[in-house]
């Protein structure tokens, strides 16, 4: 026998064994849940590949588009390419850090992130750096930060948290619907003072989309859209440079060397691209004919060098990423994780709308706006923030996968414990021997015990243990009479009945004692 001193050690050994078995079982369940390609990583490999593919295309096109202007300004044709490569490394590091943060951090910290967004937008107005008439950058030594980029992400995390905390207010009364719009309008005013109408439009579209998905009433949704369109029109009409952009967008060839110059050069780049492009590095518009060729108009250079096929490939990758973000959001909502669902939805809407505005502006479909192409255009702030957004999608998907595996593990453990506890104490106490007696219909409650009882005869039954009736008295007398034969000799059929009753009486006694 085990001594008292050795008992704790034995218990610890058993716990260690159970833990190792649970870890092994969890790994097996995860392996069974995913195919062989995803077996090495619990993350969405497809999403990682698409994001890296867009970054790779981005550095190739940025290198090609920026060489002439980099040579003229910095005497180094690879100046912007090197910086963009550094930004990509920083973006990957930032994404890896965010990937280690649980979603609980974002759920609890989103109000503080909103305060950080407001602080950044106020700081850029006070000590920001002005470029081309816009004050949008904070200079931190050799690093410049475009404050609007992290402000977008921080606002979306706050909005997702608000929709979870105030879901009933948003869906049932106007007050809950208006509250997040007040926060949005405060941020919009700070952005318009820079000025940065493009970011305001993207944030507004994402806010509308999230409120609609959260269950806002339809009339509120349409009223908000109508009010937003009126506000944008008013902002355009009362600002002369914005009005010039709109008029040049409607007819850029009316002033091809003035207000419509940038758009006409971009359209010529698209026209020269044809189906398969002029070849990588063979663009003419990048020779400083097209301003901002490596930032806002990088898609025009890509279209000129890689043609319609190249544009279609980039659009396909971004579309896949957007659809995947919406799928992750829908999966999170179905698994009762609304914060993660709304945040994933916001990333999908954000990426899709910003892509549409960037390409629409460079193709003459929309007025020109200073918005980057996600993960492709030159710009450290945009690249890092959007990489962090992709990392959030990966983290949400990872936690959903882990939840699924743990649920499978819990279900398997329950089934195992039920299987172990299936034999009852009564059935374990009696030998599983087939009986010859089958006349047990009047005793349905004790049928299982009767079926596993051993064969007995009336001679094996003690009279005191039986609840005798007047009919059973001759049986007891026959037992006491020994070998003498009386006139009331018991038949074999009566012996069987007496044995059955004796067994059932014993079962009844055992049940009452328990």
From Swiss-Prot:
GO aspect biological process, one term: cell wall organization
Gene Ontology CC annotations of this record: cell division site; plasma membrane
Subcellular location: Cell inner membrane
Catalytic activity: [GlcNAc-(1->4)-Mur2Ac(oyl-L-Ala-gamma-D-Glu-L-Lys-D-Ala-D-Ala)](n)-di-trans,octa-cis-undecaprenyl diphosphate + beta-D-GlcNAc-(1->4)-Mur2Ac(oyl-L-Ala-gamma-D-Glu-L-Lys-D-Ala-D-Ala)-di-trans,octa-cis-undecaprenyl diphosphate = [GlcNAc-(1->4)-Mur2Ac(oyl-L-Ala-gamma-D-Glu-L-Lys-D-Ala-D-Ala)](n+1)-di-trans,octa-cis-undecaprenyl diphosphate + di-trans,octa-cis-undecaprenyl diphosphate + H(+)
This protein's UniProt keywords: Cell cycle, Cell division, Cell inner membrane, Cell membrane, Cell shape, Cell wall biogenesis/degradation, Glycosyltransferase, Membrane, Peptidoglycan synthesis, Transferase, Transmembrane, Transmembrane helix
Major site of localization recorded for this protein: membrane
Main EC class the enzyme belongs to: transferase
Domain of life: Bacteria
EC number of this enzyme: 2.4.99.28
Membrane topology category: Multi-pass membrane protein
GO molecular function annotation: lipid-linked peptidoglycan transporter activity; peptidoglycan glycosyltransferase activity
Pfam families: FTSW_RODA_SPOVE
Entry protein name: Probable peptidoglycan glycosyltransferase FtsW
Organism the protein comes from: Alteromonas naphthalenivorans
Phylogenetic placement of the source organism: Bacteria, Pseudomonadati, Pseudomonadota, Gammaproteobacteria, Alteromonadales
Chain's gene name: ftsW
């Amino acid at each position: 026998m085990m001594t008292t001193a050795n008992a704790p050690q034995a218990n610890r050994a058993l716990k260690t064994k159970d833990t190792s078995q649970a870890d092994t079982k969890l790994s097996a369940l995860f392996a069974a849940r995913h195919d062989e390609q995803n077996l090495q990583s619990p993350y969405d490999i497809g999403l990682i590949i698409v994001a890296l593919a867009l970054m790779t295309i981005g550095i190739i096109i940025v290198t090609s588009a920026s060489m002439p202007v980099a040579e003229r300004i910095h005497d180094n044709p690879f100046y912007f390419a090197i910086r963009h490569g550094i930004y990509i490394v920083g973006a990957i590091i930032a994404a890896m850090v965010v990937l280690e943060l649980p979603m609980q951090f974002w759920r609890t910290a989103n109000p503080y992130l909103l305060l950080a967004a407001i602080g950044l937008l106020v700081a850029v107005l006070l000590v920001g750096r002005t470029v081309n008439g816009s004050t949008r950058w904070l200079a931190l030594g050799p690093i410049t930060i475009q404050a609007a980029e992290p402000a977008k992400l921080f606002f979306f995390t706050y909005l997702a948290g608000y929709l979870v905390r105030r879901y009933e207010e948003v869906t049932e009364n106007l007050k809950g619907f208006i509250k997040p719009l007040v926060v949005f309008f405060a941020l919009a005013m700070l952005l318009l003072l820079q000025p940065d109408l493009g970011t305001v439009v993207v944030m507004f579209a994402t806010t509308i989309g999230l409120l609609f998905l959260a269950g806002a009433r339809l009339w509120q949704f349409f009223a908000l859209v109508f009010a937003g369109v009126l506000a944008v029109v008013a902002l355009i009409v009362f600002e002369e440079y914005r009005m010039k952009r709109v008029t040049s967008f409607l007819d850029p060839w009316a002033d091809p060397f003035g207000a419509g110059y940038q758009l006409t050069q971009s359209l010529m780049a698209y026209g020269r691209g044809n189906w398969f492009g002029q070849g990588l590095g063979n663009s003419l518009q990048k020779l400083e004919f097209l301003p901002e060729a490596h930032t806002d108009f990088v898609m025009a250079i890509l279209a000129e060098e890689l043609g319609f096929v190249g544009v279609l490939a980039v659009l396909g990758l971004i579309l896949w990423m957007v659809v995947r973000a919406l799928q992750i959001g829908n999966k999170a909502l179905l698994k009762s994780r609304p914060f993660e669902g709304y945040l994933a939805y916001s990333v999908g809407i954000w990426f899709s709308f910003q892509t549409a505005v960037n390409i629409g502006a460079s193709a003459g479909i929309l007025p020109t706006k200073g918005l980057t192409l996600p993960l492709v255009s030159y710009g450290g702030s945009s690249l890092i923030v959007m990489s962090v957004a992709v990392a959030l999608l990966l983290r949400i998907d990872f936690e959903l996968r882990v939840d699924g595996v743990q649920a499978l593990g819990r279900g398997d453990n329950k089934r195992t414990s039920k299987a172990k506890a299936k034999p009852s104490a009564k059935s374990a106490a009696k030998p599983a021997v087939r009986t010859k007696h089958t006349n047990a219909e009047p005793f349905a409650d004790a049928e299982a015990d009767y079926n596993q009882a051993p064969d007995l005869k009336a001679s094996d039954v003690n009279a005191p243990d039986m609840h005798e009736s007047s009919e059973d008295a001759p049986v007891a007398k026959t037992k006491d009479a020994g070998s003498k034969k009386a006139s009331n000799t018991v038949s074999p059929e009566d012996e069987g009945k007496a044995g059955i009753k004796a067994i059932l009486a014993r079962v009844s006694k055992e049940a009452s004692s328990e």
